[in-house]
From Swiss-Prot:
Protein name: Deoxyguanosinetriphosphate triphosphohydrolase-like protein
Domain HD: 59-250
Entry similarity comment: Belongs to the dGTPase family. Type 2 subfamily.
Keywords (A to Z) from UniProt: Hydrolase
Length: 441
């Protein structure tokens, strides 16, 4: 059990309910699971566009699978490292992080993210992980002003990039476009960090750390050419969640692509099997030499067996590293893959990226979503007190009275939309043949 300070919530008063004996992290998991933001993930793009097929994964099913893998990793680590059992004492904590990790991602995946980042280019930018933190700590209406009011340790674990936007932003000459249709995502990649408005919450999360730990934890690598700075460190819990996320992305999204015929066994042989069959690790060399036959078999049970074999291989190959430069145990220890498995996971992720995500048909869907998001933002920003929903108008007006960042309210609203809702709203606003706006209710 870690220090009680990590169980604290910003709004200290707990809702006392009859015979409620749940742990703090079980409460966190319940708040995430029952939130509107989590439910909306069922209609948000994972890799393949919503509506292309009824088999593929959405961000909701992806998050559930990340949660399952995350608890599997945690169970393995508890067996391997009994001396660290006190740091791995709660499966509910890891589940909470895995369920919540994508909750801030906008409609249309990275196309929507780039679109919002461009529209917010003069107002602090936009990035999905930063929006996740914002939803958990401010926007989701479990409380009036504190979002879900989660424990400090859960919020520490969700921080993949524990520094603020202005600390990581690197000014670069980026041409503003004459038309939204000319926007290139490669020129408008977002800063990966916390929005300026949420910096006080970040400070609260990091309060228990020593000055030395905090300075090291929020430090960032110098950005390469045309790149923003990136933070160096994550907490133990975050490192487990990120490994679970990467495993699900590389393996389960691969399964979607196989079932839908987007990738072939010849592609697999060329890009994956030929590279990994010569691995120094005996298990990797053996499995990747032959597992393609099962992955691409016509019998579904053979493919599922192969997917299970791959997931198990990665989950059981995770170690814990110690960084003696940190005092706080939650920062001192991090999970990582054994080097041959880290290389194999990289090969799988690159395969999905090259053969699936960069496929022109997928990029066209992303491009279309990019246009929808930018045009919606432009419309709302042109006359927010006329076009925004009433409750969002109230937030916009409050922000205006405080001389705050009004465009952040618009970004909050659009980023919470599902793919389908954003597309229908765009049609209602810009298509002469669209029906009544009442249909959107």
């Amino acid at each position: 059990m870690t220090s009680a300070i990590w169980h604290e919530r910003r709004l200290g008063e707990e809702k006392l309910r009859r015979n409620d004996h749940r742990s703090p992290y079980q409460r966190d998991r319940a708040r995430i699971l029952h939130s509107a933001a989590f439910r909306r993930l069922q209609a948000k793009t994972q890799v393949l566009g919503v509506g292309m097929n009824d088999f593929y994964r959405t961000r909701l099913t992806h998050s559930l699978e990340v949660s399952q893998i995350g608890t599997g990793i945690c169970a393995q680590l508890k067996q391997k490292y009994p001396d660290l059992h006190h740091l791995l004492d709660s499966m509910s904590l890891i589940e909470s992080l895995c369920l919540a990790h994508d909750i801030g991602h906008p409609p249309f995946g990275h196309g929507g993210e780039v679109a919002l980042n461009y529209m917010m280019r003069s107002d602090g930018g936009f990035e999905g992980n930063g929006q996740t933190f914002r939803i958990l700590t401010a926007l989701e209406p479990y409380t009036q002003h504190f979002g879900m009011n989660l424990t400090r340790r859960t919020l520490l674990g969700i921080l993949k990039y524990p520094a603020s936007h202005n600390e990581l932003y690197q000014s670069q000459p980026r041409p503003e476009v004459d038309s939204y249709r000319q926007l290139k995502p490669s020129q408008w990649r977002p800063v990966k960090g916390i929005f300026f408005e949420d910096k006080p919450v970040l400070d609260w999360v990091l309060e228990p750390l020593s000055t030395q730990d905090r300075e090291r934890f929020v430090s960032a690598e110098p950005g390469e050419r045309d790149q923003h700075r990136r933070t160096r460190y994550k907490s133990l819990d975050c490192s487990i969640m990120e490994l679970a996320d990467d495993t699900a992305y590389a393996i389960h999204d691969l399964e979607d692509a196989i079932v839908m015929g987007i990738v072939t066994q010849a592609m697999w042989q060329q890009d994956v099997s030929s590279l990994l069959a010569g691995s120094d690790d005996e298990w990797i060399a053996k499995e990747f030499a032959t597992i393609g036959d099962k992955l691409f078999a016509l019998e579904n049970h053979l493919r599922k067996d192969a997917i299970g074999t791959l997931v198990n291989g990665f989950v059981t190959a995770i170690l814990i590293d110690e960084n003696p430069n940190f005092i706080e145990p939650l920062l001192r220890y991090n999970a990582r893959l054994e080097p041959p498995f880290a290389e194999a996971l990289h090969v799988l992720k690159q395969f999905v990226y090259k053969r699936v995500i960069r496929k022109p048909e997928i990029q066209m869907l992303e491009y279309k979503g990019q246009q929808i998001v930018m045009e919606l933002f432009e419309a709302f920003a042109s006359d927010p007190e006329r076009l925004l929903p009433l409750n969002t108008q109230e937030r916009w007006q409050q922000m205006a009275q405080q001389e705050g960042n009004c465009n952040r309210v618009i970004a909050d609203y659009i980023s919470g939309m599902t793919d389908e809702f954003a597309a229908r709203l765009h049609q209602h606003l810009f298509s002469a043949k669209a029906g009544s706006l009442i249909d959107l209710q």
